[in-house]
Amino acid sequence: ADNLPEDDPKFDGVLQIIREKQKSENNKIILFSTFRYTLYYIKRKLREAGFRVEQIDGSVKNDDRLDFRARFELPKDDPEAIDIMLFTEVGSEGLDYQFCDMMINYDLPWNPMRIEQRIGRIDRRGQGNEVVNIYNIITSDTVDADIYDRCLSRIGVFEGSIGECEEILGEIGRQIELIALDTSLTDAVSYTHLRAHET
């Protein structure tokens, strides 16, 4: 993460979203990345920008997880409050955050059901907000962008209840994982295989 360039348009876009949200009374944001070291980088950059941020991944002890969650729920004017929580998939397990109404997916996992699990951290019974905002940060002209544009957007995964799409998403997820895990395929061949799964 220390070797990442300081000129980072992807992070700059996320920072703009975060700054806008911090103007709200409910300023809480959950941000996911598949990679722990990406979160270290984001945490450093956000702290440099003056935000109160913590990270939960598989290496964080349970007592610390519970403490971070309690501080994340505090109102924004509390000096002990956390504004932004950063998670890996493993880090988010077992704790729900219905009081938070914004999630940022800094990157997207290959398996679409993991996206549902991420969303499930905040979109649970007891969510007091009428609208939950989910931002998916996808760099254009990448295989990831093509996967999600073609496979997930077409079935409206972010337009309604994820549960209704579970069967379709599961099959697409299996197809994507098979292609993604086949190390013998070049990017061009992977792209061709992914296009073949369009309906």
Residues covered by each model-derived region:
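Conserved Helicase C-terminal RecA-like lobe
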Residues: 1-84
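C-terminal accessory region of SF2 helicases/translocases
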Residues: 127-195
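A short beta-strand element within the Helicase C-terminal
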Residues: 96-107, 133
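Hydrophobic heptad-repeat coiled-coil signature
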Residues: 90, 196-198
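SF2 helicase motor core recognition
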Residues: 86-100, 120
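Conserved SF2 helicase motif VI
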Residues: 113-127
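Conserved nucleotide-binding/hydrolysis micro-motifs of P-loop NTPases
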Residues: 36-38, 60-62, 91-93, 109-111, ...
